[in-house]
Amino acid sequence: MAVALGCAIQASLNQGSVFQEYDTDCEVFRQRFRQFQYREAAGPHEAFNKLWELCCQWLKPKMRSKEQILELLVLEQFLTILPTEIETWVREHCPENRERVVSLIEDLQRELEIPEQQVDMHDMLLEELAPVGTAHIPPTMHLESPALQVMGPAQEAPVAEAWIPQAGPPELNYGATGECQNFLDPGYPLPKLDMNFSLENREEPWVKELQDSKEMKQLLDSKIGFEIGIENEEDTSKQKKMETMYPFIVTLEGNALQGPILQKDYVQLENQWETPPEDLQTDLAKLVDQQNPTLGETPENSNLEEPLNPKPHKKKSPGEKPHRCPQCGKCFARKSQLTGHQRIHSGEEPHKCPECGKRFLRSSDLYRHQRLHTGERPYECTVCKKRFTRRSHLIGHQRTHSEEETYKCLECGKSFCHGSSLKRHLKTHTGEKPHRCHNCGKSFSRLTALTLHQRTHTEERPFKCNYCGKSFRQRPSLVIHLRIHTGEKPYKCTHCSKSFRQRAGLIMHQVTHFRGLI
């Protein structure tokens, strides 16, 4: 049947013209969503957000309705329960709805002449023999007969006699011991099955009936089913197949005898599960550590049976600054602030002005700088209606109206509105000039003065006029030059109403009014 199914699938694939083209993105996103592991994320929040993103990429809730999403989920589950070869064949055609899936499978069944609800004989046989509580053996599991591993004088004995031990419970070697053990282990210690039985069990009447039954003959003749521990050669007789299958039949009988005992113990343990654990967070931490050993290495001498006590999330106290700069030791309350501060040490200036090419450490600095190009002055004085590009400039200006001068020089008694102005003034008393030019050795009391001076050595002129292309070393020079193009004359004489572009021109003009008075 497997050969016929494979040939039919290959023939259908060769007739690919009857199917429409499909989009593979949906299948890719579905596989990413289903195969995502917790250890791929840095924490629970990132893992949940990643799953949410993958699920939205797969189901596309903004484009699909609720009914379409439900149909997509049911379609996925339906394909999962199909046989492997049929599931692969259907997925390759990527049907767009459930009607297409059903029609594809019906066409394949009609081509193979298979009944709609065909049940494999070996599955039906296991369901009849295995009572409630016994382990279900997957049909694709490889059974290796222990008779092939017996060494010594007992090799010449029949297969069934050589396999059954003289004392102690028999060990089932299915080739997948870990899977069977995980299936039987519910998390609590289960009693060992007393599967010791004698050779007289072979004379049970149901065994004889099973050997002579039509279903057993079909199972032995079929190439689909269990892979017995010996190779099925073409010239192997039915009698040899029966001898090989016989230990498996006896094993089923032993499991059937122990089924009620296993079920009784399971019910007793199930009653103990009604009380939930006291600390669910501890159990969750255990589960995460067991499933994700790569997240944290456990010391070799540690006791794994000791309960884990995860540290609770520690709240930040007001004023706490846990993020410290390794270069200068300065601390910050947020990691983003530390990242911006570290750019000072590295010299990185990622934010570039598209107008003049000047670079800045922070985006806020770039935003304030761009106001110079746009002429935006969002801060307005309520007294004189003068506007400023920065709020700090507005606050300093408002002190001139209130005559508030909080910063006073102790040397000469002069007061200032800004602390920075007082600091610059104090340098006139001390004669301090900490900023020195490395080219000519000249010193300056202010850093801005040194910056302007250094442009004389480099001939840098960063301030360019957009009208005529002329460049200037200082921004005030550019502002005065722009008044030539705009015709602006902000300085007005109070005597004759004449206006001037520069304050120096107004002062020289006012001298003409006072000459007659002198």
Swiss-Prot record:
Q: What is the name of the protein in this document?
A: Zinc finger protein 449
**Disulfide links within the chain:** none
Composition-biased stretches, type Polar residues, lie in 292-304
Q: Which stretches of the protein fold into C2H2-type zinc fingers, per the record?
A: 323-345, 351-373, 379-401, 407-429, 435-457, 463-485, 491-513
Which SUPFAM superfamilies does this entry report, sorted A to Z?
beta-beta-alpha zinc fingers, Retrovirus capsid dimerization domain-like
Under PANTHER family, the record lists:
ZINC FINGER AND SCAN DOMAIN-CONTAINING, ZINC FINGER PROTEIN 449
Q: Where in the cell is it found?
A: Nucleus
The free-text function statement in the UniProt record for this protein reads: May be involved in transcriptional regulation.
Q: Which family does it belong to?
A: Belongs to the krueppel C2H2-type zinc-finger protein family.
Q: Name one GO cellular component term.
A: nucleus
Classification via InterPro entries:
SCAN_dom, SCAN_sf, Znf_C2H2_sf, Znf_C2H2_type
Q: Which residues form the SCAN box domain?
A: 30-112
Specify the domain of life of the species encoding this protein.
Answer: Eukaryota
DNA-binding listed as a keyword = yes
Keyword terms: DNA-binding, Metal-binding, Nucleus, Repeat, Transcription, Transcription regulation, Zinc, Zinc-finger
Where does this protein come from, organism-wise? Homo sapiens
One example of a Gene Ontology biological process annotation: spermatogonial cell division
Name the Gene Ontology molecular function terms of this record: DNA-binding transcription factor activity, RNA polymerase II-specific; RNA polymerase II cis-regulatory region sequence-specific DNA binding; sequence-specific double-stranded DNA binding; zinc ion binding
The segment annotated Disordered runs over: 292-325
Question: What Pfam families does this protein map onto?
Answer: SCAN, zf-C2H2
